[in-house]
Amino acid sequence: MTYRLATAEDLDRLVAMSDQAKESFKAKNIDQWQKGEPNRQVMEASILRSQLHVLEDTGQVVGMITIVPGPEASYASIDGAWLNQEPYFAFHRVCVEESMKGRGLAARLFSEAEQYVLKTGVRNIRIDTHPDNQAMQRALAKSGYICCGTL
């Protein structure tokens, strides 16, 4: 598997993967990604800012994660408390190809993205997910993330 920055050539595949995820959420009555985002324009902008990263297996993109430097307005106030107020990166739009789920790819994405962040000298990561997205909550806990509260 290869971890790399996404390119414009990946865009159709990334849109297809996010559309699959939207349908999966909808089928499970999870109101995540049901209001239009992520969409092609959001992903294209993330590619142009070198924030969208992918995991590739035998030439096929099978996972994606967006890495954004903080601060972010949505993280300014939470019902709970962050571990600290030091600089951080935020992970967004984590997605794994539906047919590849259950193979540890989310953990691999987190691990690779964490290494990317550490190379910048930043030691904090923030991430949020929908309260009904139990699969992502389990993946985050399994990867050592600590729930600090709700947005």
What kind of feature is each model-predicted range?
Residues 2-16:
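A short beta-loop-alpha structural element at the N-terminal edge
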Residues 6, 94-96, 129:
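Hydrophobic adenine-recognition pocket in adenosine-nucleotide-binding enzymes
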Residues 22-42:
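Conserved GNAT-fold acetyl-CoA-binding loop/helix
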Residues 51-67:
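Conserved beta-hairpin
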Residues 66-95, 101:
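Conserved acyl-donor/pantetheine-binding loop and adjacent beta-alpha core of acyl/acetyltransferases
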Residues 96, 102-115, 138-142:
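Conserved acetyl-CoA-binding loop-helix of GNAT-fold acetyltransferases
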Residues 107, 119, 131-149:
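Conserved active-site alpha-helix within GNAT-family acetyltransferase domains
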Residues 110, 117-129:
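Conserved GNAT acetyl-CoA-binding A-motif
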